[in-house]
Amino acid sequence: MHQFLRAIGFSNITKKQLNEVINNIIDKPEKLKVTKDSEGNEFAELSCDVAPNMGITVRGIYNDDDSFDIDYYYPYFMGSEKTTDEIIDIEKHSEKESYAGVCDDPNLGVTLIFYLQNVCDYLSEKAYINREVRAKGAVLSGLSVDGCILLPMKQKKAKTLNTVDSDKKDRKQLIAEARDGDEGAMESLTMEDIDLYSSITRRIQNEDILSIVTTYFMPYGIESDQYSVLGDIIEFTEEKNIITNEKIYCIKVSCNDIIFSVCINKNDLIGEPMVGRRFKGNIWMQGSICL
């Protein structure tokens, strides 16, 4: 059973109940997309929402007699706005017909990897142009089963904010130059990191780490598309799973200057979300590429 089902309101679902849900999706999908997969099979995505912008997608192959063979399913949560404008490369997972999006966003400082939602769109576009697809941007979202709400940081003065924005812009430029092989930029980034480490080491003697670090975005665990994040809450809504009636928070966060939405079961979130507070949690990153 998929560990992130609880993020969309299926915290106590049994295997029998899940099979019923999946069979209902196959019989009466709300959304159906069909294309040819990498081996020439009639590959299909069948989806149904259980709450606004979230639900379960079943992927598999249609046979010549119109019977459907399930390959796998996964819970999804659709983002609401474009997260990055960077070029996205697509890589196929080895074990099944699923894909990952990969991009280097200078805001994050790490390679961003996410689970691709619109696989049929990607395969159709790839077949149409008869070459590899490099998408320009993606709409990202995260599913979380472990999160908490933190108080906001003390507001900085306008002059300080302007300095911070200028420093961020300079760092992005250095990262871009370093990726192009500029040794001077690499050396500058290394020195910045050493200075930052020294500063944090001094401050952490008397301060809590979460009062020093405003936001962060870093890999979590052994899966390449899972991250530990800390970001400012921009807006949030409370939704309800129409099958289980479990409540789900949809939280839009700003994290390292990128914006994405996270869904989490209300029972898995410690604290009360409010605009201006911070969300801290571990997420499974998904995304739809812009074609």
Q: Where are the regions that the model predicts?
A:
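N-terminal alpha-helical "arm" segments
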Residues: 1-42
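Long, hydrophobic alpha/beta structural blocks
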Residues: 36-221
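Short amphipathic beta-strand/extended segments with alternating polar/hydrophobic composition
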Residues: 112-114, 261-266
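Eukaryotic intrinsically disordered and solvent-exposed regulatory patches
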Residues: 218, 237-239, 267
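Short coil-to-beta-strand transition motifs
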Residues: 220-232, 277
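OB-fold (S1/OB) nucleic-acid-binding surfaces
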Residues: 234-262
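Short nucleic-acid-contacting surface segments enriched for D/E, G, S/T with interspersed K/R
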Residues: 265-281
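Short, Lys/Arg- and Gly-enriched loop/turn segments at beta-strand edges
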Residues: 284-291
